[in-house]
Each structure stands twice: as structure tokens, then as C-alpha cells.
A protein has these predicted regions:
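Glycine-rich FAD pyrophosphate-binding loop
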Residues: 30-52
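Conserved beta-strand-loop-beta-strand element in the redox core of flavoprotein oxidoreductases
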Residues: 178-197, 202
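Dinucleotide-binding Rossmann-like beta1-alpha1 core, especially the glycine-rich loop
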Residues: 56-129, 254-257, 295
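Beta1/beta-strand and adjacent pyrophosphate-binding region of the FAD-binding site
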Residues: 6-21, 39
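Flavin (FAD/FMN) cofactor-binding and adjacent substrate-gating region
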Residues: 81-83, 97-168, 172-173, 178-185
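C-terminal catalytic lobe of FAD-dependent flavoproteins
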Residues: 298-408
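Central helical "cap/lid" subdomain
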Residues: 194-246
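Active-site lid/adjacent beta-loop-alpha segment flanking the redox-cofactor pocket in flavoenzymes
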Residues: 221-223, 237-343
């Protein structure tokens, strides 16, 4: 049944986006303030078609940026409470050069200072993990983070939706075509159906579609949220059971891999970044042979054992996905109130790693509770004000290749 723009809904909070960020925010808001009238809108409720639906689900907590470390730690604490969708299998960073090994030692020291357990593994300890890596990699250096793990983003998202619904949050499948303003204040949203829904607070948890939505609202400043395409491949299903293994990252090669249960997955950032200027209805793009095939070939060559299920030619296993996610000029989320626009809030460019932590922080900001002001300042959506859109886009795209170098 359509929701009309009547008096009953003028004081409600609308969240656009029902991925893990929007759904977890709806839960935390409804838990902290049961009287809050919350509506979550998404063009697809039954299917999760945003980045949440395609994210590999790596959850590494240590980051060279303290704010992201804290948000990741907070997120893991929340995910473990759900008893579903998160497995603490640990995370490995592997290096094969002296420089890479030195970097691992540096990250070990820094992670310990941050209060996160980590240790370097010797060759014998690596072998005991029974990783699906080629023999030539058996002697590589490895840094192990035992408290890291892997998430099933869609499972986590569904759990938060369910808990939010139990708290009275409403989820409606609808496509938002614009933001309605009165002066410098948000008063509602306009749907593609022509309806207008009133609200006093509006949260954009719109991920890769943020820029395109803001382009339709000339009264709202643009933000440097740049959608990019990313290759991820799945191996053939295994014909035998194996013990769960830690997720693996090779920072020197910009490659990562994880065990998905019946098969392995591999992704790589070792290619020129590709801006997706007009995202479609899902967070995917057609696979680009000329760009992705060479990168994936480099990623799997001499890296995995034969029983990992990969092949050295397309489709490299069983399935290839051209995923889409957002980058920003400093590889940090945009979270908080939008300056100069009363009632508008933003929660975008957020990975599963930090989603619950970001949602809890925004809930505190919106309800005027005590919150970490230093982290909020780091994530302020207006922190790039004064710089040109062209410069910010170029800077954001440059961040793509550094995602799994040292800032993991």
C-alpha cells in the first residue's frame, strides 16, 4: 500500500538504502529510540542488489587509520552478537620479498599498539593451516590476525532487517527519484511513481548511487563518492570437505582470497581503476575481458594449488563477477550531517568491515547522544569542501590500487 505524504509521516525518519548500512542503522536507531518513526526505502527489498549483495566479506580490523580500526572493532563486536553471518577464521597477510616482510613486521608492531592480537608465522605454522596455495608460496612470510574473520554480508543484512522490523521499522520497495526541499531543509522524498513521502530526517545510505541521486537535487552539494568496478572470481566447487581457512591477502600483489565454504574466491586490485559513471540497477557491470582477464591471470598464476579449483584461462573457475563499490579521496566513509541542509544525513562508501560501527556512530549523532567526535570529524561528509570535483575524482580513483597495499 502506498504511503502518502500526510501529517502522520512528517516527523518520520527515512533511510534510503536497505543494504547492511541502512538496515543496521534502522536497527540501532529503533533500539535506542523506540518511539522514532522509521521508514527504509530501497528499489529492491527482496533481492539485495547493492554492494552488500556482492561484497566478498573480508573483515580485517587493523588499519593504519585509527578511526577505521575502531569502527572495525566495534563492527566485529556487533556481528558476533548476531550468532550468524560472521566467522572468526582469522586473517593472513603474506609477503615474498624482504621489503614485504619488513612491512609485515611494522604492521605487527602497530597492531599490537592498537590492542589487536597478531603474530608472525613461521613456515611450519603456515603449513599447518593447509592453505590452498602453491608449493612455491610455502616459505613466504605471514602475519596472522586471529580475531579477524569473514562475513556473509547478505546474512548480516537480513538479520538487521529482521530485528529492525521487530522494533517497528517499516521497509518499502520503492525507487527514489529526488529529494524534496523547503528552503535549506529536507521535507521528504519523491518516488518514481510520482508520490511524495514526508520526513523530518533523511539518511542517504545509497552507496554507489549517491552521486547520481544528488545530481537530481541541485540544492544539495555534491560529494566525492566514486563508483568503481572490481573483478572477483569463484573457483569450481570442491568435491571434498576442508577445514575453514583464514582469509588471505598478498599486499605486494594487490590480491586477496577467501574460502566461501564449497569454493574459493579471489579478487585483485592490480589493474587500472575504472570509474562507473552511470551505475545500473545492481552493483555489477559486465566483465571486461581486456581489463580484468590479465589482472586475474596475474592474481592466480603460481599462487594456488591445483585442488583450489581455479584454471589459468577464463572464466578461471566457475564464475566471474564485475562488482561495483565506492571509493573516496581518502578511502574513508562519508558519515554524518550534510552541512547547510537541515535534516539530511549521509552514510556512504562504507564497507562491511565498518558498517555496524558506522551505523552506531551515526545513531548517536542523530539522537544527540555522546559520540566520538574525533572519528566523526574524520568522516565528515563536508571535509573535501573547496576542492574541485575533477580533482577529487582523480584522487579517489588513485586510492583504488592502494586498498590492499598497506591500509588493509
Amino acid at each position: 500500500m502506498p504511503i502518502m505524504a500526510d501529517q502522520d509521516h512528517q516527523n518520520q525518519t527515512i533511510i534510503i538504502g536497505a543494504g547492511i548500512v541502512g538496515s543496521s542503522l534502522a536497527y540501532f536507531l529503533s533500539k535506542a529510540s523506540p518511539e522514532t518513526n522509521i521508514l527504509v526505502l530501497d528499489r529492491s527489498i527482496s533481492d539485495i542488489v547493492g554492494s552488500t549483495g556482492y561484497a566478498p566479506g573480508f573483515v580485517g580490523q587493523y588499519n593504519e587509520k585509527p578511526s577505521l580500526t575502531k569502527l572495525a572493532v566495534d563492527s566485529v563486536k556487533e556481528y558476533t552478537k548476531l550468532n550468524t553471518g560472521f566467522s572468526r577464521v582469522g586473517g593472513l597477510e603474506l609477503a615474498s620479498t624482504d621489503a614485504g616482510t619488513k612491512t609485515l613486521q611494522s604492521r605487527l608492531d602497530a597492531s599490537k599498539k592498537a590492542g589487536l592480537p597478531a603474530r608472525l608465522l613461521d613456515e611450519t605454522e603456515i603449513a599447518k593451516l593447509e592453505l590452498p596455495i602453491a608449493g612455491s608460496n610455502a616459505g613466504t612470510a605471514a602475519l596472522f590476525f586471529p580475531d579477524d574473520g569473514v562475513a556473509e554480508p547478505k546474512v548480516l543484512c537480513s538479520a538487521y532487517r529482521s530485528m529492525a522490523s521487530e522494533n517497528g521499522v517499516r521497509f518499502q520497495e520503492a525507487s527514489v527519484s529526488g529529494i524534496v526541499m523547503a528552503g535549506d531543509a529536507v521535507t521528504g522524498v519523491r518516488l518514481e511513481s510520482g508520490e511524495t513521502i514526508s520526513c523530518s530526517k533523511l539518511v542517504l545510505a545509497t552507496g554507489i548511487w549517491t552521486a547520481s541521486l544528488l545530481q537530481k537535487s541541485s540544492d544539495i552539494p555534491s560529494v566525492p563518492v566514486v563508483p568503481v568496478s572490481h573483478p572477483y572470481i569463484y573457483s569450481k566447487d570442491r568435491d571434498h570437505e576442508v577445514s575453514p581457512t583464514p582469509f588471505m591477502r598478498w599486499p605486494e600483489s594487490h590480491v586477496y582470497a577467501r574460502d566461501h565454504g564449497a569454493r574459493y574466491g579471489v579478487g585483485t586490485y592490480d589493474h587500472a581503476p575504472q570509474h562507473v559513471s552511470s551505475p545500473g540497477h545492481t552493483a555489477t557491470v559486465p566483465w571486461r575481458d581486456e581489463l580484468f582477464n590479465p589482472a586475474v591471470t596475474r592474481a592466480i598464476a603460481n599462487r594456488f594449488s591445483a585442488d583450489a579449483g581455479f584454471t589459468d584461462h577464463p572464466p578461471f573457475g566457475a564464475e566471474v563477477i564485475g562488482g561495483v563499490f565506492s571509493v573516496t579521496p581518502d578511502n574513508m566513509p562519508l558519515l554524518g550531517p550534510v552541512a547547510g541542509v537541515e535534516g539530511l544525513w549521509m552514510a556512504v562508501a562504507i564497507w562491511v568491515t565498518h558498517a555496524a560501527g558506522c551505523a552506531m556512530l551515526l545513531e548517536k549523532m542523530m539522537l544527540r547522544e555522546a559520540y566520538d567526535e574525533d572519528i566523526a570529524k574524520d568522516l565528515d561528509p563536508g571535509r573535501f569542501e573547496g576542492r574541485s570535483e575533477e580533482e577529487l575524482e582523480v584522487t579517489a580513483l588513485k586510492q583504488y590500487n592502494d586498498i590492499y597495499s598497506t591500509d588493509c
